[in-house]
Amino acid sequence: MTRIRRGYIARRRRTKIRLFASSFRGAHSRLTRTITQQKIRALVSSHRDRDRQKRNFRRLWITRINAVIREGGVSYSYSRLIHDLYKKQLLLNRKILAQIAISNKNCLYMISNEIIKEVDWKESTGII
């Protein structure tokens, strides 16, 4: 039985993998086996960190909002603000509130003060 030379098929497959790993350091960008291992590892990490990124940004937004609210001097916290926002049925999510907190603190103070006034007024009159 004669040996069949496979031509460029294997080389094309390896160069495709090498293009993915061209920015890796050392043997991770030169040796085929380590390239394939590092490619798998990189894809796993990117998939995992896409979910983590959502969590981390939510934590960051909550921290920013809470810092600005507590800085205002009123005994008001993040959890009360969010609770009152839901009571008022305002469609301001945490990302928007964090952007407002960074760019214009006074605007966030005004929003929180208006919410406090309306919720306190409704509770005192017995509407809620």
From Swiss-Prot:
Question: Which GO cellular component terms are attached?
Answer: chloroplast; ribonucleoprotein complex; ribosome
Q: Which CDD domains match?
A: Ribosomal_L20
InterPro entries per UniProt: Ribosomal_bL20 (IPR005813), RIBOSOMAL_L20_CS (IPR049946), Ribosomal_protein_bL20_C (IPR035566)
- Asked if the Swiss-Prot or TrEMBL record annotates the protein with the keyword Ribonucleoprotein, the reply is yes
Q: Where in the cell is it found?
A: Plastid, Chloroplast
The cross-references to Pfam families, in alphabetical order and at most eight, read: Ribosomal_L20 (PF00453)
> Keyword set for this entry?
Chloroplast, Plastid, Ribonucleoprotein, Ribosomal protein, RNA-binding, rRNA-binding
List the signal peptide residues: none
Q: Which GO terms describe its biological process?
A: ribosomal large subunit assembly; translation
Q: What is a single molecular function from GO for this protein?
A: structural constituent of ribosome
Main subcellular localisation: plastid
Matching entries from NCBIfam families are given as: rplT_bact (TIGR01032)
**Role this protein plays:** Binds directly to 23S ribosomal RNA and is necessary for the in vitro assembly process of the 50S ribosomal subunit. It is not involved in the protein synthesizing functions of that subunit.
Q: Which family does it belong to?
A: Belongs to the bacterial ribosomal protein bL20 family.
The name on file for this protein is Large ribosomal subunit protein bL20c
Q: Which organism is it from?
A: Panax ginseng
